[in-house]
Amino acid sequence: MKPSIVAKLEALQERHEEVQALLGDAGVIAEQDRFRALSREYAQLTDVSRCFLEWRKVQDDLATAEMMLDDPEMREMAQEELKDAKAATEELEQQLQVLLLPKDPDDERDCFLEVRAGTGGDEAAIFAGDLFRMYSRYAETRRWRVEIMSANEGEHGGYKEVIAKVSGDGVFGQLKFESGGHRVQRVPETESQGRIHTSACTVAVMPAVPEAELPEINAGDLKIDTFRSSGAGGQHVNTTDSAIRITHLPTGIVVECQDERSQHKNKAKAMSVLGARIRAAEMAKRQQAEASTRRNLLGTGDRSDRNRTYNFPQGRVTDHRINLTLYRLDEVMEGKLDMLIQPIVQEYQADQLAALSAEPE
């Protein structure tokens, strides 16, 4: 391992011990905000610290085994220990490289999840509903909370558009690779000839950031319309103009919110989504600049990003970004998404490692 990397790991190890001591300090415990921040830092440093300590132990074993090679009686055992120590060193160094990759500061944040029906009419809306249910089931398995911010239901089920806030540990980091186009191939229930139709939806995943970190939005740049809500809601539907539509004139971004009965609450929700969308659009521009120099697996939520195809007759799901095909569609639609998410996370990390190794010392 490069001396510069060892030096960096030693510094992180020292910081881990320092933070551990601070967390036991009564003065720090009394300051809730500082205690929380240090607890997060400690959790982030724990894995790399543990892995580095294990690597150091293996290096000691390696040195001991090399010394034993000079002893004829111990040589055979030493060669076996040397082989094991070298294999362990290689594995631990790979783990440490991944742990040292630059962290996306947004990865630990909650996120806004948008699913929109694209081409395919009613069938696209039904599939948007299926996708949203899939993500909701996945959230349940990870003990995340899903709160619908806005829902525009399809005429025959599903959603023309649904926006939800997903809250929990590491939400954005897990879901960010879902942004892009999702295509379905199946026979719609309304299809009497049994023909397979192709429909599409787009998914956009944006980090939910604190208000202080959102781009400044000038009131003069906004066009705000009120209208009567439609869809579920019983006797309260269509009685007041509580639904809100906000248009950000410089970017053309439009957000609607009609889930709450209060116009004030709908406006607050719409503004939080609008801020996240504007920030996401700015980040997408930066990603496109990066993509000109290297492959970019992170989608922008645009329909031109073709992420996956869900083929129901074949029970197949294909991720086109990494050429991964699984014949486990039923499980995927029930929310078992780790089998799709983890391979693309690993591919993304491999790309990051390749970019880092190409940089000069």
Curated annotation (Swiss-Prot):
Disulfide bonds: none annotated. Residues 287-313 are annotated as: Disordered. Signal peptide: none annotated. PROSITE patterns: RF_PROK_I. Its main location: cytoplasm. It is found in: Cytoplasm. The modification N5-methylglutamine is found at residue 235. Methylated by PrmC. Methylation increases the termination efficiency of RF1. It comes from the Bacteria. Belongs to the prokaryotic/mitochondrial release factor family. Peptide chain release factor 1 directs the termination of translation in response to the peptide chain termination codons UAG and UAA. This is Peptide chain release factor 1. It comes from Serratia proteamaculans (strain 568).
